[in-house]
């Protein structure tokens, strides 16, 4: 067969790129469940240590551009997300954007921590309960960043785990108990951090039970990438009050 038809532009959908940690077992499934069919999702991986510490998180900065480059510039990505809440906190969201835009200069860049702050502001939530899986040094840096950006942290509940393989196996029941413990002192919302925590399926249940917004890393990142690309989350399966605000 020497002649055949082909499309000159086979993919006219919104194109999202996602830089996933090599140790993450969760975010890809949760993203697929949330994104509308009008979006194409392209994944790449970045080397990450199996143990989450301030030093190992900072080490990822040098690999961001190379990881982003595994998705060709010719794909013309609308938005690129760096899928690590703690990594973006330690490296700095602006530094993440600089590294990614060295490769994809015309793409917007989102991180979970900036997405969470935008989501909380969209919800009008200022008094926040936090749930993290991290060791204290990492949780404290994230807490400080939120405070610097005008949020009050009413409670911080952590599993205090440094091993990613364990984080990915924390049960839904354990996460729900932690959220309930953080939803105290008149919190406007609870923020559940980490892209490797399985959270998307518990958001609606917890919001109904507690009567406040639940914002998670994967939910907020999907919402932020979609809205940055001009896609209404009403077209998506992003859960919670966030998608209805």
What are the functions of these language-model segments?
Residues 97-120, 206-225:
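Short, acidic/small-residue loops that bind anionic groups at enzyme active sites
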